[in-house]
Amino acid sequence: GSVVASYPYDDSPTHRLTGVYSKSADDEVFKYLAKAYASHHPIMRTGKPNCPGEEAETFPDGITNGAQWYDVEGGMQDYNYVWANCFEITLELSCCKYPPTSELPKEWENNRESLLAFIEKV
């Protein structure tokens, strides 16, 4: 897990594991939407999720191009964008993929304003 807003493309022409920025035709729109979410999230906006084992991982403005972070061939985000013209971003909301129930109220508070800001944009 991590705490970041990721936008298309997740796949790159070279299929390298990481480090290849794969720009879509709507790159600026996707960055705008990702920043709309990330800028209201108390952890995401720092760009430093500080997840165990990935302490050095950083994301400027709390966002990343999917393929630049790690390449995903055949992902739903890219498929829906290319074939259905759906503008989707992927939200990684916690270092822990399955946080304990006791942490859910905190997660709601961390994401409430981000969700509202994102909905206002879309």
Regions found by a protein language model. Give the residues of each.
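Metallocarboxypeptidase
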Residues: 1-122
